[in-house]
């Protein structure tokens, strides 16, 4: 029997699936010599573009007399899928002991995004001089690795035997507390079991907590276990204690059926009683680690983000020849459709290896017969609707506008179903190789709401997410309904969505903000949706691709 007042569960860690700690390992090959007699003493400086400026965040150690260094010091960064995170790697010669690069010590640099590195696991790029030319045949290789274990969970089961009796007319009511030792040597409570009434041989309920909560992901961190006899007054009687580490707990229960036990010691009794042995024993009956896969696990395991664009060409956007039109192609300012395309697509393209994106339009009359279509290729090639990079999507959009007639209605279901087709074929593989993201840019109320709800409910069971950006000042109430944030979306027949896959954002909320703010908002949910889908299907990430640079080890610094 347990006392509910004593049952305590720590606050679970926030589900920040989009944020991970990434370590970058850097090596260079063929660095330029400063002169014919000496080789450089290279160091790599890492800068991150933040708040409109480049800020140094990390640097490697200096290696002496080495033109092809493999650095041992890792460069650590927080990774966010929904942010672009541009990086610069500057290589300089620290022969004279300088701690910052100067023109005469500069050996080359390169620029890329963190997304490009993690999606490819390993990136090799030429080093460029300040004039933009290659620094000879110099190259830099960056290898990404996620800091593992931060999302793992632990399942533990404890029981005790022959605990000291602290009650006069009945038996003890034992419970146990677990503490981890912090860096400042203070103890932090991480778990308290329930109370087992009137029992000197209690079996506590199994419990589950994150490895971070238990030991801050440090398997060698000291853990302290304290056993008490519960008292309703709050003055619980101390029975005994013992210490361990998670490493020891894992090793002691490594084999099937293997258990680990500790003597429960009361220091006061041990010091005063000559023949004192213990105040009972505590047994660890189960210690298992549950691997919780992250978004980066799937990306680094080879999962590609397949990005598709759908653009609203209904008449409610206004005549493109008018400066008031949402599709106006002004030479001075890109319209909202273009701004959203660049902001969101610029990030998604880093996660697609071939950088080719299907782009469709809906709600327009299209040549040659000028019949209304709700899923036409904006490059007018139905057999190959893909565009080369986001710049290709933008170019096709610009060429498409003068050739079509904006019409209506605003039917969204056809394009959702079109993208759902390949997603369903991907689902049948049972592997985490391709996840589809559909970006819908629209200016108004959905005309086929019932069909759209049905299409979304169907897509919620597939490896697919939908991002809707509302352009203009229309009433977007229906879009918020599709988002599902206020409750589970259902199709007209009452079938619920398997998961929330729609993210809606009105562009007007970001028209005065930076493009990165819009991208951050609309893409923030994608990592969670990716992990949710594959976890629901029991699909693990693929094995990380080999990424060790094949280079000769550097001489010792």
UniProtKB/Swiss-Prot annotation:
Binding positions (Ca(2+) 2): 167, 229, 231, 237
Boundaries of every C2 domain copy: 1-127, 134-263
InterPro entries: C2_dom, C2_domain_sf, C2B_Copine, Copine, Copine_C, VWF_A, vWFA_dom_sf
Cofactors named for this entry: Ca(2+)
Biological process terms in GO annotation: cell differentiation; cellular response to calcium ion
Sequence similarity: Belongs to the copine family.
Protein species of origin: Bos taurus (Bovine)
Chain ranges of the VWFA domain: 306-526
First and last residue of the signal peptide: none
Keyword Cell membrane in annotation: yes
Binding-site residues for Ca(2+) 1, renumbered to this chain: 167, 173, 229, 231
GO molecular function annotation: calcium-dependent phospholipid binding; metal ion binding; phosphatidylserine binding
Record note on quaternary structure: Interacts (via second C2 domain) with OS9 (via C-terminus); this interaction occurs in a calcium-dependent manner in vitro. May interact with NECAB1.
Entry's Gene Ontology cellular component terms: axon; clathrin-coated vesicle; dendrite; endosome; membrane; perikaryon; plasma membrane
Predominant place of localization: cytoplasm
Region span, Linker region: 244-303
Domain notes for this protein: The C2 domain 1 binds phospholipids in a calcium-independent manner and is not necessary for calcium-mediated translocation and association to the plasma membrane. The C2 domain 2 binds phospholipids in a calcium-dependent manner and is necessary for calcium-mediated translocation and association to the plasma membrane. The linker region contributes to the calcium-dependent translocation and association to the plasma membrane. The VWFA domain is necessary for association with intracellular clathrin-coated vesicles in a calcium-dependent manner.
Pfam families: C2, Copine
Task of the protein: Calcium-dependent phospholipid-binding protein that plays a role in calcium-mediated intracellular processes. Binds phospholipid membranes in a calcium-dependent manner. Plays a role in dendrite formation by melanocytes.
Keywords linked to the UniProt accession: Calcium, Cell membrane, Cell projection, Cytoplasm, Cytoplasmic vesicle, Differentiation, Endosome, Membrane, Metal-binding, Repeat
SUPFAM superfamilies: C2 domain (Calcium/lipid-binding domain, CaLB), vWA-like
Classification via CDD domains: C2A_Copine, C2B_Copine, vWA_copine_like
Cellular compartments annotated: Cytoplasm; Cell membrane; Endosome; Cytoplasmic vesicle, Clathrin-coated vesicle
Protein name: Copine-6
């Amino acid at each position: 029997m347990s006392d509910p007042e004593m049952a305590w569960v720590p606050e679970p860690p926030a589900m920040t699936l989009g944020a991970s700690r990434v370590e970058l390992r850097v090596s260079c090959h063929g660095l330029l010599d400063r002169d014919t007699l000496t080789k450089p003493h290279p160091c790599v400086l890492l800068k991150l573009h933040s708040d409109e400026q480049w800020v140094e965040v990390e640097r490697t150690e200096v290696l002496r007399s080495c033109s092809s260094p493999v650095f041992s010091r890792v460069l650590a960064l927080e990774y966010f899928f929904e942010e672009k995170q541009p990086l610069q790697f500057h290589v300089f010669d620290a022969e004279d002991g300088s701690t910052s690069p100067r023109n005469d010590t500069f050996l080359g640099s390169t620029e890329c995004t963190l997304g490009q590195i993690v999606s490819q696991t390993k990136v090799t790029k030429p080093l460029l001089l300040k004039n933009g030319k290659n620094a000879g045949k110099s190259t830099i290789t960056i290898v990404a690795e996620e800091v593992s274990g931060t999302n793992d969970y632990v399942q533990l089961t404890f029981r005790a035997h022959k605990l000291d009796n602290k009650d006069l007319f009945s038996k003890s009511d034992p419970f146990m507390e677990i503490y981890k030792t912090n860096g400042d040597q203070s103890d932090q409570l991480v778990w308290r079991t329930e109370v087992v009434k009137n029992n000197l041989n209690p079996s506590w309920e199994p419990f589950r907590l994150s490895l971070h909560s238990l030991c801050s992901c440090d398997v060698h961190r000291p853990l302290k276990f304290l056993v008490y006899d519960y008292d309703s007054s709050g003055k619980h009687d101390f029975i005994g204690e013992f210490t361990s580490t998670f490493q020891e707990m894992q090793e002691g229960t490594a084999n099937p059926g293997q258990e680990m036990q500790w003597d429960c010691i009361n220091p006061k009794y041990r010091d005063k009683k000559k023949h004192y042995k213990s105040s009972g024993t505590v047994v660890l009956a189960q210690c298992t680690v549950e691997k919780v896969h992250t978004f980066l696990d799937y990306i680094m395991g080879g999962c590609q983000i397949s990005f598709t664009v759908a653009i609203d060409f209904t008449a409610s956007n206004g005549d493109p020849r008018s400066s008031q039109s949402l599709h106006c192609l002004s030479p001075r300012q890109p319209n909202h459709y273009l701004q959203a395309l660049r902001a969101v697509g610029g990030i998604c393209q880093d996660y697609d290896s071939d950088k080719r994106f299907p782009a469709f339009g809906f709600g327009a009359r299209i040549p040659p017969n000028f019949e209304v279509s709700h899923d036409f290729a904006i490059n007018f090639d139905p057999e190959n609707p893909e565009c080369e990079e986001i710049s290709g999507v933008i170019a096709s959009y610009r060429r498409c506008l003068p050739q079509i007639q904006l019409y209506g209605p605003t039917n969204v279901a056809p394009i959702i179903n079109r993208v759902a087709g390949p997603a369903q074929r991907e689902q049948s593989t049972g592997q985490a190789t391709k996840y589809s993201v559909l970006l819908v840019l629209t200016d108004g109320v959905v005309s086929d709401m019932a069909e759209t709800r049905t299409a979304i409910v169907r897509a919620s069971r597939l490896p697919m997410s939908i991002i809707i950006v509302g352009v203009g000042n229309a009433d977007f109430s229906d879009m918020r309904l599709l988002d599902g944030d206020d409750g589970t979306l259902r199709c007209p027949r009452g079938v619920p969505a398997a998961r929330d896959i729609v993210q809606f954002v009105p562009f007007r909320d970001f028209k005065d903000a930076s493009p990165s703010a819009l991208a951050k908002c609309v893409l923030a949910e994608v990592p969670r949706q990716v992990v949710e889908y594959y976890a629901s299907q029991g699909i693990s990430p693929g094995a990380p691709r080999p990424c060790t640079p094949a280079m000769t080890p550097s001489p010792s610094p």
